UniProtKB/Swiss-Prot annotation:
SUPFAM superfamilies: Ribosomal proteins S24e, L23 and L15e (SSF54189). Belongs to the eukaryotic ribosomal protein eS24 family. The gene is rps24e. This is Small ribosomal subunit protein eS24. It comes from the Archaea. It comes from Methanococcus maripaludis (strain C7 / ATCC BAA-1331).
Amino acid sequence: MDISIISDKNNPLLYRREIKFTVSFDAATPSIKDVKMKLVAVLNADKKVLVVDTLDQIFGKLEAEGYAKIYNDEKAMATIETKSVLEKNKIEEEAEAEVAEE
């Protein structure tokens, strides 16, 4: 799985960085968890404040386009981000925690 950053914009009004990216892969579309972990590694960001908002498959290609946000802190993320996006990203973190406990 390869990630290419299309744009990286700082948005000081909403206390975040906004990243648009493309993901190239060989088999099935990667999960949000996999993309999030790869973005954490590529961007050297904290996984607690990184949110993958969208990940859309490009028809007929082994590529997907995505949009992620890196907040300055968790408080800003909790007040600005919608519940559905937080749940989508939080479920992945909870699954990670359960695996780590076992």
